[in-house]
C-alpha cells in the first residue's frame, strides 16, 4: 500500500530511526489503524552494541516502531497533516519474545482515542504470528 518513500512523505523519521519499511493496510476514516512491517536486518546500527554476540532488537525500539506505525495513521488524517508527533507516555508495555536479525517485525497500531491534540494508540508487534511486544502509546501533536 505505502512503500518507504511514501512513508517518508508522511512521517518525519529518517535513518537510522525510521523503523517501518512498508504499510500493508490502513484505515483512517472509521476504525483508525495502520498495519505494516519492519524487515530487521543484521546491518541495523543498534545490533553493534545490543548485543554483538547475540543481537536482539532493543524493546524500546520495538515500541518506537509501533509509535511510528500509529504516526502514519495520525498524520494521514487531514486535520493533523504537517504536525509534529511527540511521545506523551507509554502504558501497559509487555515484551513477550525476542526480535533478532532476519525477522520480519509485523506492526499494528490502532488509534483508540483522540481528544484535541492528544491521543492514545494500541500497538502490537509480532514475529511469525506471535506477539513480541504490545503497548498503549500516548501521543501529542504540535
Curated annotation (Swiss-Prot):
Catalyzed reactions: a (3R)-hydroxyacyl-[ACP] = a (2E)-enoyl-[ACP] + H2O
GO biological process assignments: fatty acid biosynthetic process; lipid A biosynthetic process
Keyword annotations: Cytoplasm, Lipid A biosynthesis, Lipid biosynthesis, Lipid metabolism, Lyase
GO cellular component terms given for this protein: cytoplasm; membrane
Annotated GO MF terms: (3R)-hydroxyacyl-[acyl-carrier-protein] dehydratase activity
InterPro entries per the UniProt record, alphabetical: FabA_FabZ (IPR013114), FabZ (IPR010084), HotDog_dom_sf (IPR029069)
Compartments reported by the entry: Cytoplasm
CDD domains, per database record: FabZ
EC number: 4.2.1.59
Entry keyword annotation includes Oxidoreductase: no
Statement: the UniProt record of this protein carries the keyword Secreted: no
Pfam families: FabA (PF07977)
Record: active site: 50
Annotated family: Belongs to the thioester dehydratase family. FabZ subfamily.
Protein name: 3-hydroxyacyl-[acyl-carrier-protein] dehydratase FabZ
Amino acid at each position: 500500500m505505502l512503500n518507504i518513500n511514501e512513508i517518508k512523505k508522511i512521517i518525519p523519521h529518517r535513518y537510522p530511526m525510521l523503523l517501518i519499511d512498508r504499510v500493508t493496510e490502513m484505515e483512517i476514516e472509521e476504525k483508525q489503524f495502520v498495519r505494516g512491517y519492519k524487515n530487521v536486518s543484521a546491518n541495523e546500527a543498534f545490533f553493534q552494541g545490543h548485543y554483538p554476540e547475540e543481537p536482539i532488537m532493543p524493546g524500546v525500539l520495538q515500541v518506537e516502531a509501533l509509535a511510528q506505525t500509529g504516526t502514519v495513521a495520525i498524520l494521514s488524517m487531514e486535520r493533523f497533516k504537517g504536525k509534529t508527533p511527540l511521545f506523551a507516555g507509554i502504558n501497559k508495555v509487555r515484551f513477550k519474545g525476542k526480535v533478532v536479525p532476519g525477522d520480519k517485525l509485523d506492526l499494528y497500531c490502532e488509534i483508540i482515542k483522540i481528544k484535541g491534540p492528544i491521543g492514545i494508540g494500541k500497538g502490537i508487534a509480532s514475529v511469525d504470528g506471535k506477539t513480541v511486544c504490545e503497548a498503549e502509546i500516548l501521543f501529542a501533536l504540535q
